[in-house]
């Protein structure tokens, strides 16, 4: 696959139109807004930076790197182990449901794009979008850092668009936020991908509480 084709595939994977339900979940933000923890755009940026620094950089990216290497080596046992570890790091039922739902949706795309994906790997990909992205990145010969950029941009944009609806703030503020969050992501991503096993784990107790409380929140825009 040529470099141009690979870049276009990355754009497709990062697109908000990818039908995996990324905009259906708020990851606890909806309850945090109702509770008064995130009252304005400045508070939202602080909240999201904390989720990135203490969650995405310490769980998602290190585990994505391990899943990618397992796919490179064809080591499904390792991929299964790290996928189970990822689900264990999702601290609420809501977060685990999101992971599985996004994985199932991505696996349906995978069946269309790569119908020759082995059944055992397809079953694994149904459990987590990260597993599916890792397998597809290896199959399409897209390097790990490039896949991680696509994954991160999609996560940032989904979070900011949730903030637009919930906090709320306008589209211009949203674009400024995306720029700043992307700069932070690009600066810290290499270190997160290289994190040792002992550093894996989240430190976002307020986000876990917000997600748990969102499961029974009376009025909701986002899924639980």
From Swiss-Prot:
> Does the record bear Protease in its keywords?
no
Q: Which InterPro entries match?
A: UreF, UreF_sf
Compartment(s) where it occurs, according to its Swiss-Prot or TrEMBL record: Cytoplasm
Heme in keyword set: no
Q: Which GO terms describe its molecular function?
A: nickel cation binding
Any Gene Ontology CC annotation: cytoplasm
Subunit and partners:
UreD, UreF and UreG form a complex that acts as a GTP-hydrolysis-dependent molecular chaperone, activating the urease apoprotein by helping to assemble the nickel containing metallocenter of UreC. The UreE protein probably delivers the nickel.
The UniProt family comment states: Belongs to the UreF family.
- State the protein's name: Urease accessory protein UreF
- The record's gene field reads ureF
